[in-house]
Swiss-Prot record:
Homology family: Belongs to the phosphoglycerate mutase family. BPG-dependent PGAM subfamily.
Gene for this chain: gpmA
UniProt name for this protein: 2,3-bisphosphoglycerate-dependent phosphoglycerate mutase
Keyword Isomerase: yes
GO biological process: gluconeogenesis; glycolytic process
Cysteines joined through disulfide linkages: none
Listed PANTHER family: PHOSPHOGLYCERATE MUTASE (PTHR11931)
Residues noted as binding substrate in the record, renumbered to the chain: 10-17, 23-24, 62, 89-92, 100, 116-117, 185-186
Length: 250
């Protein structure tokens, strides 16, 4: 039986990744480097013989534009795509827009690490009258008050990502379609934790690099049997380490 594969791609570097700012649901675009990363991811997938039947992404343009660039390199720009807020980055609450290193200088490296990587720890909440509250954004007009976050932990992100996986994405994979997901560091960490049944301490140390294809292989029961990145292992490790260091004081 042929091995079933799934490809995950964290968006390429965004303008605020470059500025080391907490982004969350703020809709910043890719940097020039991020666009290059996305194109390189597409070329890697092409070189490895990947092609897809369906794509999923968030409603944030850094993920959408990453997917565009990947599919363009694969000559699959025509591919059907479903966009869902459930694949958005985790909401960073009142930290959105703040510089990570400056925040670490103010609150300490460990506090910022817990905000960034702690499983059930939420950053400080937004207020509903804050311009950053997603209820002011027309793309979220159909969401209920309960669905509109003021802040999120990874645990809360899992509560929206995993049902979307089980109810929407997995059935398509089970039907035989080849799927790619372009999303965000924490929405993908949420999915990886679920798929690999990771503990809270283990997920704390997982850093997903920007613009690198992450391939899952599944058995006939759609249980993961292998997870690996495409590309140069040393470069990928360096990029993951850079992600880990973003939240440290200078």
């Amino acid at each position: 039986m042929a091995v079933t594969k799934l490809v995950l791609v964290r968006h390429g570097e965004s303008q605020w990744n470059n500025e080391n700012r907490f982004t969350g649901w703020y809709d910043v675009d890719l940097s020039d480097k991020g666009r290059s990363e996305a194109k390189a991811a597409g070329q890697l997938l092409k070189d490895e013989g990947f092609a897809f039947d369906f794509a999923y992404t968030s409603v944030l343009k850094r993920a959408i534009h990453t997917l565009w660039n990947v599919l363009d390199e694969l000559d699959q720009a025509w591919l059907p795509v479903e966009k869902s807020w459930k694949l958005n980055e985790r909401h960073y609450g009142a930290l959105q827009g703040l510089n990570k290193a400056e925040t670490a200088e103010k609150y300490g490296d460990e506090q910022v690490k817990q905000w960034r990587r702690g499983f059930a720890i939420t950053p400080p909440e937004l207020t509903r009258d804050d311009e950053r509250f997603p209820g002011h954004d027309p793309r979220y007009a159909s969401l209920s008050d309960k669905e509109l976050p003021l802040t999120e932990s990874l645990a809360l992100t899992i509560e929206r990502v995993v049902p979307y996986w089980n109810e929407t994405i997995l059935p398509r994979i089970k039907s035989g379609e080849r799927v790619i997901i372009a999303a965000h560091g924490n929405s993908l960490r949420a999915l990886v934790k679920y798929l690999d049944n990771m503990g809270e301490d283990e997920i704390l140390e997982l850093n997903i690099p920007t613009g690198v294809p992450l391939v899952y292989e599944f058995d006939e029961n759609f249980k993961p049997i292998k997870r690996y990145y495409l590309g140069n292992a040393d470069e990928i490790a360096a990029k993951a380490a850079a992600v880990a260091n973003q939240g440290k004081a200078k």
